[in-house]
Amino acid sequence: MPNQINPNLTSWASELDDNALEQALRTSRLPILAGPVCLMADAHFGLGATVGSVVATKNALLPSAVGVDIGCGMVAAETSLTAAELPDDLKALHGLLRDRIPAGVGKGHGRAGTTMTPALVALGLPPGSASELSARQRTTIAVQFGSLGSGNHFVEVCLDERDRVWIVLHSGSRGIGNQLATAHIKTARLVAQEENQVLEDRDLAWLTEGRPEFDAYVSDMLWAQRYAWGNREQMMDAALAALRSVAPHAVETQRINCHHNYAVKENHGGEEVWSPARVPSGPVARTWASSRAQWERRRSSCAGRAVRCRTSPARMVPAVGSVARLRSAS
């Protein structure tokens, strides 16, 4: 059962440190809330809004509630293989994954001109900031598309309860998503001064619907979400190709690709609200209660946060249900 900390704050967190709790309490006092702040099972301290929280707002958006890795999420592909059909020695697969999926801080593919896939060409540039992008940022967009990144991002070959082989991947919008988010959070601070927003934390500054700064953020956020989705798709294609190199009869049977750092405008009880979610990795299902009293949620824990291993770039580490994991540098 959730813990109702106050009328505007509900927590499902089994462990919540004092810093994260104080941060969530500050968020719960914002005047733009459309419902209570909800903390997920492993919520923890972050920039402005708590990582592992859902913060629904009305007529405004809170960039820090979306997070600095806009569109970060998971993609999982089920294959026709079972554990018994995998090679006994997975070193070759590990090497292929390392070669085909760049991992680590700032890592990407070669030169920009060699990485302009049709998906990337169709994506274009972030519309809210296109005129302000430097040549280096434009290059970063190209060379980092199809790369893992750092922190708790990973690609993993694992097994389900039927011993069916899956590939699971965790990544987001890479350097450009972080840069866009950081720039818009700074803009929100300036807007807060203009609007005389009363803030307990300047990183809880919001953008009011109808302002040009709001429109610019939404357009860039949606672009970064598409970039992150495509980034995961490209890496998953590369990972499956690597798997087929060691198991040629492997067939992809289904794929699930979803964000967990995002915002979407939804209608609840006849009222339009923005639902930013800055939540750890894992499946999530949410429904808005008819009384608009709270968000209900059922979800798994974060991807590698609570039980993370500090490893060198792209080193295999064991995980529950895992055959092999390619882990980015922490």
Feature annotation, model-predicted:
Residues 2-23, 32-39, 45-51, 55, ...:
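Domain-length cofactor-binding catalytic modules of enzymes
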Residues 65-128:
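A generic, well-ordered mixed alpha/beta core segment in the N-terminal half of proteins
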Residues 41-42, 69:
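Acidic active-site catalytic centers that drive phospho-/nucleotidyl reactions
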